[in-house]
UniProtKB/Swiss-Prot annotation:
It comes from Caulobacter sp. (strain K31). S-adenosyl-L-methionine binds at T134, G157, D179, N224. GO terms for molecular function: protein-lysine N-methyltransferase activity. This is Ribosomal protein L11 methyltransferase. Pfam families: PrmA. Keywords: Cytoplasm, Methyltransferase, S-adenosyl-L-methionine, Transferase. It catalyses: L-lysyl-[protein] + 3 S-adenosyl-L-methionine = N(6),N(6),N(6)-trimethyl-L-lysyl-[protein] + 3 S-adenosyl-L-homocysteine + 3 H(+). One of its GO terms (biological process) is methylation. Methylates ribosomal protein L11. SUPFAM superfamilies: S-adenosyl-L-methionine-dependent methyltransferases. GO terms for cellular component: cytoplasm. The keyword Methyltransferase applies. The keyword Protein biosynthesis does not apply.
């Protein structure tokens, strides 16, 4: 196997084309773990962009193949042989979401006294708190815990572990996180130690891992992944929750909200809150 030279692939175009390409990436059999984002770049021009960061030659070729099928302008550049993502994010400002203050080491000297301060360093795992989906989850969770506490919490697609760590730091007795990406699991474990949070993380696809099933059922499930996995996991998430339990769904675009909601409402869930941030949506639903 040859070493892969890190690349960034950027595709720009109309919203419908960018969203269709993103759906195609999600459904491509060779791109299950591909890292990409989709966002609105210029509202006046109706311009959207996809940023993709392949890690292998196969991912690189697969992404280019998918993007070539849509009327998007695709450019690419070679990234420096360095921890380029950490370098790009190291200067990010802290994020405030309700009672939560998410920061990096560069902001350690200006922490508010009245917040739950969570140190999450920039890196390859998703979930520094800056993305609209993660902020939406934190905002929804902050509102929920004003009324009640959640003793047992599951975080599906944990990334940096931020959401499970936030739960552990605000009174959850059990906080379990899963991710399909092994480096993310390692990073989330490190973040739990740094934040002195009693949260456990495992490498798992779906909800079948023994650590997940042994601690079920849960009072609260976070699922900050993508729209199609959210739909396919609807029944498993229902099974993992106690009757009356809560799920916070994120990782979906506003345009995908209706179909994701339908998968849960058809199983008896009730929508109790919605949060929109940028192009992203978060749904809070209660199990019957």
């Amino acid at each position: 196997m040859t070493d892969y030279t890190p690349q960034q692939i950027v595709a720009r175009g109309a919203r419908a084309d960018a969203e269709a390409a993103a759906d195609a990436i999600d459904n491509h059999p060779g791109l299950e773990g591909a890292t990409y984002s989709i966002l609105e770049e210029d509202e006046d021009k109706g311009l959207w962009r996809i940023d993709a960061f392949p890690t292998t030659d196969e991912e690189d070729a697969g992404l280019l193949e998918v993007l070539a099928g849509y009327p998007l302008k695709v450019v690419r550049e070679t990234l420096a042989d360095a921890d380029w993502l950490a370098m790009a994010l190291s200067g990010l400002p802290p994020v405030r979401a309700g009672r939560f203050f998410v920061y990096g080491m560069h902001d350690r000297g200006r922490l508010p006294a009245s917040t739950v301060n969570l140190r999450i360093e920039a890196g390859a795992a998703f979930g520094t708190g800056h993305h609209g989906t993660t902020v939406g989850c934190l905002m929804a969770y902050d509102k929920l815990i004003k009324a009640r506490k959640f003793k047992k919490v599951l975080d599906v697609g944990a990334g940096t572990g931020l959401l499970a760590i936030a739960a552990a730091r605000t009174g959850s007795r059990i906080a379990v996180g899963t991710d399909i990406d092994r480096p993310s699991v390692r990073i989330s474990k490190e973040n739990a130690k740094v934040n002195r949070a009693n949260a456990k993380f495992v490498h798992a696809s779906g909800l079948g891992h023994r650590l997940v099933t042994d601690n079920a059922p849960y009072d609260l499930v976070f699922a900050n992944i993508l729209a199609r996995p959210l739909i396919s996991l609807a029944q498993d998430i229902k099974t993992a929750l106690v009757p009356g339990g809560t799920v916070i769904l994120s990782g979906l675009l506003r345009t995908q909200e209706r179909m994701v909601k339908a998968a849960y409402v058809s199983r008896g869930f009730k929508v109790v809150n919605r949060i929109h941030r940028d192009a992203w949506a978060a749904l809070v639903l209660q199990r019957p």
